């Protein structure tokens, strides 16, 4: 596989996940219950678990040619979240994202996801992408609808009922 690609938008630089991101990613996303409650396993993770997620994510990049990008604000360089695609053995690749509370409501999730989806559809010729959202996470559902995802009902994953959304590439 080729080296992971850096993507850029008007306000973000999307950099493939790396081992050096562990503490900063933990501090930005995984140590904040208001953010982590919407991510499996629905709670704060210890930094060691975040390091393991990074190891798995880097293997995913090597295997599939896509994965998780760290989201850095272009102006400040600050890490504000992550966004990416994960291969799913039982269905379509899955769009995943999370942003720190300090940037909620600014459209950055939509901006990052649009860049990831454009890359995925253009480079990997995917037919469709899925996303799964906890029903109480209405902000995330709005992001997906802005990106033209369509609700497909609910599924049971991660010991919870999640709303399932699909975006078909045309």
Description of each model-found segment:
Residues 57-70:
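A short helix-loop-beta-strand connector motif used in the catalytic cores of GNAT acetyltransferases and
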């Amino acid at each position: 596989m080729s080296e992971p690609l850096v993507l850029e938008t008007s306000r973000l630089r999307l950099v493939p996940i790396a081992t050096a991101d562990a503490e900063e990613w933990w501090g930005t996303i995984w140590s904040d219950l208001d953010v982590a409650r919407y991510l499996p396993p629905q709670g704060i993770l210890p930094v060691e678990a975040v390091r393991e997620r990074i190891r798995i994510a880097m293997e995913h990049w090597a295997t599939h040619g896509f994965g998780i990008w760290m989201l850095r604000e272009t102006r400040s360089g600050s890490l504000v979240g992550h966004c990416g695609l994960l291969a799913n053995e039982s269905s379509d690749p899955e769009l995943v994202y999370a942003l720190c509370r300090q940037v909620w409501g600014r459209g950055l999730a939509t901006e990052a996801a649009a860049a990831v989806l454009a890359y995925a559809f253009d480079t990997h010729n995917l037919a469709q992408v899925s996303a799964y959202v906890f029903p109480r996470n209405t902000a995330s559902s709005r992001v997906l609808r802005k990106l033209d995802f369509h609700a497909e009902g609910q599924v049971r994953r991660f010991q919870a009922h999640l709303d399932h959304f699909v975006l078909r590439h045309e």
